[in-house]
Amino acid sequence: MSNLDTQSIINTISNSKKQTPVRVFIAGEKLYQLQIPNEIEAFISPTSGTLFGEWKYVKALLESSSQITHYRVENDSRNSAVPLLDKKEVNARIEPGAIIRDQVLIGNNAVIMMGAIINIGAEIGAETMIDMGVVLGGRALVGRHCHIGAGAVLAGVIEPASAQPVQIDDHVLIGANAVVVEGVHVGTGAVVAAGAVVTKDVPAHTVVAGVPAQIIKRVDNTTSQKTALEDGLRNL
């Protein structure tokens, strides 16, 4: 279970220092003469360079430095409350375009596909695949060896505030474009059909479908064969 409860996440966002980080490419003459403040990280040659830092400091430098004749600013957030996760040492496969915020836990050999959005406090178990375009809301908990299908949404706890997160147990398959609402617990080995809207707990080893989702049967051999996961996709 996550160490972050709902109020802790809300407090983290509310009290964090909001940031507008930028990367700026500059050109000019005698750039080595620039008076660069400590808040800005700079890589400079006499006629070109790159600056990294908070926009208010970089903006002030650009406006006050006659040595800079041209510049280009790259920026992808404004007053951001939570930074993105540093993915370099995560023992998982994370494809380009996945957006993962800080304070997310990702288990060994998990797979995060393109376009997935994973919010603060979420946990993803070992060997679980988060498919393309999935949204894991704040503090959503997903167990081991699951598949969360493309476009599925596991609701977060932040707004509206919910004391209990979505909890997906081990070996669960969530079909494409399914929605699991706040506080729902999906039991071990369950299957949620594509497009289902899950508004109440799902017992282990059952299949649910529909809007709202209803139990349609127990998981049997046929279901297990149709929903079997490919472990080779989880190799690193």
UniProtKB/Swiss-Prot annotation:
Belongs to the transferase hexapeptide repeat family. DapH subfamily. It catalyses: (S)-2,3,4,5-tetrahydrodipicolinate + acetyl-CoA + H2O = L-2-acetamido-6-oxoheptanedioate + CoA. GO terms for molecular function: tetrahydrodipicolinate N-acetyltransferase activity. This is 2,3,4,5-tetrahydropyridine-2,6-dicarboxylate N-acetyltransferase. Pathway: Amino-acid biosynthesis; L-lysine biosynthesis via DAP pathway; LL-2,6-diaminopimelate from (S)-tetrahydrodipicolinate (acetylase route): step 1/3. Catalyzes the transfer of an acetyl group from acetyl-CoA to tetrahydrodipicolinate. The keyword Endoplasmic reticulum does not apply. The gene is dapH. Keywords: Acyltransferase, Amino-acid biosynthesis, Diaminopimelate biosynthesis, Lysine biosynthesis, Repeat, Transferase.
